[in-house]
């Protein structure tokens, strides 16, 4: 995961007219000893990248949260499938082991919002 991928994911979902100018980035350090489950592309439903039908993906995420098998789930990015997003489950007991950096303010280059 990277800040640049997070920004891309943000931009495809935000109403650009309502995008705040005072964003922050908070890095997370996940200990090597912490279980990180991974969803491979082959495990995802057909058409998983299509924005029109996200229900199967939402169901997958909800089932992961309910199962409480890990605090972190690594999933392919729909925008750049060779890169990954990390979903965090704050209800999992291992979530407290994740170390958080201080928030770092940043703003988007105005060209992103044109």
Question: Model-found features: residue ranges?
Answer:
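Long, hydrophobic N-terminal alpha-helical segment
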Residues: 1-22
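Active-site and NAD+-binding cores of ADP-ribose-processing enzymes
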Residues: 18-114
């Amino acid at each position: 995961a990277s800040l640049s991928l997070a920004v891309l994911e943000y931009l495809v979902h935000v109403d650009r007219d309502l995008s705040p100018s005072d964003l922050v980035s908070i890095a997370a350090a996940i200990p090597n000893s912490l279980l990180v489950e991974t969803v491979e592309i082959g495990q995802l439903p057909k058409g998983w990248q299509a924005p029109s039908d996200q229900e199967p993906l939402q169901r997958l995420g909800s089932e992961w949260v309910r199962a409480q098998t890990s605090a972190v789930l690594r999933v392919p990015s729909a925008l750049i499938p060779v890169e990954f997003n990390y979903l965090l489950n704050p209800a999992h007991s291992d979530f407290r082991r994740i170390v958080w950096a201080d928030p770092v303010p940043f703003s988007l280059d105005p060209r992103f919002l044109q």
